[in-house]
Amino acid sequence: MDLLQPLNLPPYPFKITEHNGEYTLFDELRKKTIIITPEEWVRQHFVQYLIKDKGYPKTLIGLEGGMKLHGTARRTDILVRNNKGEKVLLVECKAPSVAITQGVFDQVARYNMVHKVPLLTVTNGLQHYYCRIDFVNERYDFLEELPEY
């Protein structure tokens, strides 16, 4: 089934249920059952990757946070803070069928004009790009992998 396709992330034991052709899972961060879309499948895997493989505390991970950009409401997929409440990681998730293009990078860069986060990630579950932003020297560097928390 394409909806639950394997991703380039470790598999996690989600509790998936099917009802009338819709698949759902329990989102442990939002504490509710959600419908699985291809983008949500990627988001849920990446959240588990952050928690289980990279050591990010789940209490510091926010999902689909609202923000205003040039007067328009937007939503970030994943925003992680440190224990001081400072934003440290912004993740933009796309469905596996969505190519990671310059337009996707432009989108996350626009979001980061608001958030000013030092680590950015763009993923479609198959490809992952990690970037460290140096605001002082106005530059960025792509990273081979996401740093541990």
Regions found by a protein language model. Give the residues of each.
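A short, conserved, highly charged catalytic patch centered on acidic carboxylates
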Residues: 1-119, 126-149
